[in-house]
Amino acid sequence: MVVKVGINGFGRIGRLAFRRIQNIEGVEVTRINDLTDPNMLAHLLKYDTTQGRFDGTVEVKEGGFEVNGNFIKVSAERDPENIDWATDGVEIVLEATGFFAKKEAAEKHLHANGAKKVVITAPGGNDVKTVVFNTNHDILDGTETVISGASCTTNCLAPMAKALHDAFGIQKGLMTTIHAYTGDQMILDGPHRGGDLRRARAGAANIVPNSTGAAKAIGLVIPELNGKLDGAAQRVPVPTGSVTELVVTLDKNVSVDEINAAMKAASNDSFGYTEDPIVSSDIVGVSYGSLFDATQTKVMEVDGSQLVKVVSWYDNEMSYTAQLVRTLEYFAKIAK
């Protein structure tokens, strides 16, 4: 049985999700909705500065484009309620615009001739289940209509924090994500559409402090850590490839080797482990949602009290997209 997917919003995440779905048997994209001209969408699908050229053929046709011989309809509806997903057999919508990230807004895809399920590619709030695959995807029972795939940083932080908490117990902690610049920053100094004075500065020429909800949102993924973590972001001049540092106090004293052993034991398809001295360009395109770096683990002890730092890499584009697609595929399999 083939699960048919619709993508609303064909930006960075929408296009990369489309790429990954091409390699998954039993899942296919049959419709894309985006306000941009199909010629532009096709061009941006074919050519990608950070992720490389699309491995396949893309041809613009009337009403959409043809990818590897398969026609995908492209529409340009502003209101999700006006997208006739059912005509193209769409069962699950990947909501990737950023504008319909709350449950009530995302549910518009389910109205009229809509789809059956929605996966939001952003934090969705307290009234939807927030899923980080291979960390808490077992909270899904298939009856849900709208779920959230959290954020790219939460997908990096969550598996590392869970492994640390399961093994040693986290008391409290602060995280910092050293994050690639994104499309919501200016290329050159100029007014920021959201009024942010720092994101108004040239993204490729500055380290730009920014907020992140990833640490606080961890409670939606790992309830035992609710209220125990906080954090911030520093946007840096790289186009993709980010890293998260987590500094915590634990319930018990530990060694660097014990921490690394626990992380290695917890590794899986979503949570990688490396002892190589890598840099940010080395993780561009990786499919791990989080890649733990054992070379950066630190334990500081003063008067018997310890402070622990752990570090994990992520491609804030592809790592996150890979996790979203894993979640979507699983959600489709258990759907009721």
Swiss-Prot record:
Subcellular localization(s) per the UniProt record: Cytoplasm
Primary residence: cytoplasm
Enzyme class, UniProt record, top EC level: oxidoreductase
Family of the protein in this entry: Belongs to the glyceraldehyde-3-phosphate dehydrogenase family.
Active site positions: 152
GO biological process, one term: glucose metabolic process
PROSITE patterns, per the entry: GAPDH (PS00071)
Function of the protein: Catalyzes the oxidative phosphorylation of glyceraldehyde 3-phosphate (G3P) to 1,3-bisphosphoglycerate (BPG) using the cofactor NAD. The first reaction step involves the formation of a hemiacetal intermediate between G3P and a cysteine residue, and this hemiacetal intermediate is then oxidized to a thioester, with concomitant reduction of NAD to NADH. The reduced NADH is then exchanged with the second NAD, and the thioester is attacked by a nucleophilic inorganic phosphate to produce BPG.
Any one GO CC term of the record: cytoplasm
NCBIfam families in UniProt: GAPDH-I
Protein name as annotated: Glyceraldehyde-3-phosphate dehydrogenase
Subunit architecture: Homotetramer.
Enzyme Commission code: 1.2.1.12
Source species, domain of life: Bacteria
Residues that, per the record, bind NAD(+): 12-13, 34, 78, 121, 316
MF GO annotations: glyceraldehyde-3-phosphate dehydrogenase (NAD+) (phosphorylating) activity; NAD binding; NADP binding
Keywords tagged on the record: Cytoplasm, Glycolysis, NAD, Nucleotide-binding, Oxidoreductase
Gene for this chain: gap
Pathway(s) of this molecule: Carbohydrate degradation; glycolysis; pyruvate from D-glyceraldehyde 3-phosphate: step 1/5
Substrates-to-products reaction catalysed: D-glyceraldehyde 3-phosphate + phosphate + NAD(+) = (2R)-3-phospho-glyceroyl phosphate + NADH + H(+)
Record InterPro entries: GlycerAld/Erythrose_P_DH (IPR020831), GlycerAld_3-P_DH_AS (IPR020830), GlycerAld_3-P_DH_cat (IPR020829), GlycerAld_3-P_DH_NAD(P)-bd (IPR020828), Glyceraldehyde-3-P_DH_1 (IPR006424), NAD(P)-bd_dom_sf (IPR036291)
List of residues binding D-glyceraldehyde 3-phosphate: 151-153, 182, 199, 212-213, 235
Marked site positions, Activates thiol group during catalysis: 179
